[in-house]
Amino acid sequence: MKNIKLSLLDQSTISKGDTAINAIKHTVSLVQKAEEWGYNRFWVSEHHNLASIAGSAPEVLIAHLAAVTQNIRLGSGGIMLPNHSSLKVAENFRLLETFAPGRIDLGIGRAPGGDRITASLLNPGNRFKEEDYIQQINELQLYFNDQVQTQFGVVRAIPVVYDEPPIWMLTSSGSSAFTAADMGLGLAFAQFISAHGAKQAIEVYRTRFVPSEIFPKPEVIIAIWVLCADTEEKAHELKQSLLHIFLQMEKGEVRNGIPPYDEIKDYPYTLQDRARMEANSARLIAGTPEQVKEQIINLATDCDADEIMAAAITYLPEDKVRSFELLAQVFGMI
């Protein structure tokens, strides 16, 4: 059997009737459990102007997570680079490296993490051009290598640290696989966003990969929704709830937080709705522990991934916690 590492991604989602404060508290509690259960890394996301997600500043949240953990790797999944100055991102993650030496990952992406208007307010200079994103990545690497030269001298990202956080490039379309390979970065494919394309993107990445100091060989993560439950009935409820949330997000109708299953179980779906839900099923893995284990092994083997990063959205925080506990158990981590 392929040796698969398991990690977690959390977005600090807000359930209907709950608060953002509690959502962040649940994330903090979850990272401690993830460390106890033996997960390899724990990443948090960047989203803006979304009523159902509290995680807007991963660099701030990671600092707190570092203070309550000892060994687990912590990172961003990801920093949406066009929203930020490359220098400021380099400084933020070097500072995080001083809090948790050897435990920080910098996952970067080019999506806005919200709507285009909000992205423009975050960075009024954002032209939404791919070439600008590539330039920012180059700048980021130069800052990490203390090689940014201006007419007035070298500009350094402070503080200077012994080890730089590894850069992971996030992609959901596969286009960034070329860039990640050419630059010698890690690749994280977001199958939780895009149901298809992981295998092709990873093949391109591994074929083109140019070794770098931090990544002497290609490394691949696939991030996917994982819902693991004690019974098939419970797994079905969690899956249907998540598919409903996807549908509402696509329609722009998630305004009051994540709803409970009882509220949506009799929803009058149209034929088009059901078709979308069926298509979105490929973005997730759901079932009992053994069923989930088989699907994860098949996914990692088929796509040649080194690591699976599990994410989950549930109305009850304890359902998410139980899901990840069962996942750790079935893989023999606890």
Regions of interest found by a model, annotated:
Residues M1-K2, I62-Q70, E97-R103, Q147, ...:
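Acidic (Asp/Glu)-rich catalytic clusters
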Residues M1-T69:
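N-terminal beta1-alpha1-beta2 module of alpha/beta enzyme domains
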Residues K2-A20, N83-Q147, L187:
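Flexible, glycine-rich active-site loops centered on histidine and acidic residues
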Residues L6, G38, E46, L65, ...:
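Conserved, mostly hydrophobic/aromatic
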Residues L6-D10, F42-V44, L74-S76, I104-I108, ...:
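Hydrophobic faces of well-ordered beta-strands that scaffold small-molecule active sites
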Residues D10-K25, I79-L87, V161-T171, N280-P289:
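Active-site mouth loops of central-metabolism enzymes
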Residues R127-R156, G197-D304:
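An alpha-helical appendage that flanks or caps ligand/catalytic pockets
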Residues A177-H196, A201-I202:
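A conserved active-site cap/scaffold subdomain adjacent to cofactor or substrate pockets
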